[in-house]
């Protein structure tokens, strides 16, 4: 599967069935976000002569942290950044963060956002343009909260939690790149097109996405602006509406 275009050193690496591991590179240093498995990431880094300096974890699910121990065997000094509320489920974290924390990585500020819903301690990482990076793109690593055309299942949270999280992410600058952790765009938009068959924004985007996937390319990253145009979950005006959409999507087998 071909990779999407790289922007500001942010690289998507497709692993397993549909996971996307993001690798953020500057010079010979790399940060990996939600490594599902170790081997393909080790290979990717080695082929480029890169050194792992940190791992960002959005939540505790095995297809997001499964590769971290293997990466640490190779780079034992790498920082593992994760939610303080998930210390028991991500025990190898070395830097525990909370909502509102700001850290500097690879010369850029990174802000931590509490987006609990998919899990009770899910966080996202936002790289704003800010004063020291005005030439760079705003980037969001959002794990399984906001998907391209969808949102994560509610394993530990409520529709109100997800509505709150999505509205918060949706308030980020419209040009912000949405780097989610799964390539679900086509299925999400097929479902959305069934719900809103007369919505040209959704149907037009679906046609583009279908062509992209047929060509063997990824559809990610998306953007906050694109999600406002065609993501029914982000467009939901209440937690009740979001809950109904989520329940319907959970049972959809299209």
Curated annotation (Swiss-Prot):
Catalysed reactions listed for this entry: an S-(2-hydroxyacyl)glutathione + H2O = a 2-hydroxy carboxylate + glutathione + H(+)
Cofactor list: Zn(2+)
SMART domains xrefs: Lactamase_B (SM00849)
Keyword Metal-binding: yes
Chain sites annotated for binding Zn(2+) 2: 63-64, 144, 182
Gene3D superfamilies for this protein: Ribonuclease Z/Hydroxyacylglutathione hydrolase-like
Pathway it works in: Secondary metabolite metabolism; methylglyoxal degradation; (R)-lactate from methylglyoxal: step 2/2
Enzyme Commission code: 3.1.2.6
Pfam families associated with the record: HAGH_C, Lactamase_B
Keywords linked to the UniProt accession: Hydrolase, Metal-binding, Zinc
CDD domains on file: hydroxyacylglutathione_hydrolase_MBL-fold (cd07723)
Cofactor note: Binds 2 Zn(2+) ions per subunit.
Enzyme class label: hydrolase
A GO molecular-function descriptor: zinc ion binding
Source organism superkingdom: Bacteria
Residues engaged in binding Zn(2+) 1: 59, 61, 118, 144
Keyword Magnesium among UniProt keywords: no
GO biological process: antibiotic catabolic process; methylglyoxal catabolic process to D-lactate via S-lactoyl-glutathione
Disulfide bridge positions per record: none
PANTHER family documented for this protein: HYDROXYACYLGLUTATHIONE HYDROLASE (PTHR43705), HYDROXYACYLGLUTATHIONE HYDROLASE GLOB (PTHR43705:SF1)
Subunit structure of this chain's protein: Monomer.
Known function: Thiolesterase that catalyzes the hydrolysis of S-D-lactoyl-glutathione to form glutathione and D-lactic acid.
Family: Belongs to the metallo-beta-lactamase superfamily. Glyoxalase II family.
Name this protein carries in UniProt: Hydroxyacylglutathione hydrolase
Natural source organism: Synechococcus sp. (strain CC9311)
């Amino acid at each position: 599967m071909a990779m999407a275009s790289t922007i500001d050193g942010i690289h998507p690496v497709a692993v397993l069935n549909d996971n996307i591991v993001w690798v953020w590179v500057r010079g010979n240093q790399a940060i990996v976000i939600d490594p599902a498995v170790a081997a393909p990431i080790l290979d990717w880094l080695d082929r480029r002569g890169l050194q792992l300096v940190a791992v960002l974890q959005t939540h505790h699910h095995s297809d997001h942290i499964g590769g971290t121990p293997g990466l640490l065997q190779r780079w034992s000094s790498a920082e593992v950044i994760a939610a303080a509320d998930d210390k028991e489920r991500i025990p190898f974290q070395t830097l525990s963060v909370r909502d509102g924390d700001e850290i500097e990585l690879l010369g850029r500020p990174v802000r931590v956002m509490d987006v609990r819903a998919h899990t009770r301690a899910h966080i996202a990482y936002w790289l704003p343009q800010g004063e020291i990076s005005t030439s760079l793109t705003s980037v969001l690593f959002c794990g399984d909260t906001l998907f391209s055309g969808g949102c994560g299942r509610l394993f530990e949270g409520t529709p109100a939690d997800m509505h709150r999280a999505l509205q918060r992410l949706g308030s980020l600058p419209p040009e912000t790149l949405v780097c989610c952790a799964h390539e679900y765009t086509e299925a999400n938009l097929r479902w959305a097109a069934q719900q809103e068959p007369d919505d040209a924004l959704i149907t037009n985007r679906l046609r583009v996405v279908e062509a992209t996937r047929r060509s063997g390319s990824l559809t990610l990253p998306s953007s906050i602006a694109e999600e406002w145009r065609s993501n029914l979950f982000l467009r939901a005006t209440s937690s009740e509406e979001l809950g109904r959409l989520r329940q319907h999507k959970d049972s959809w087998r299209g």
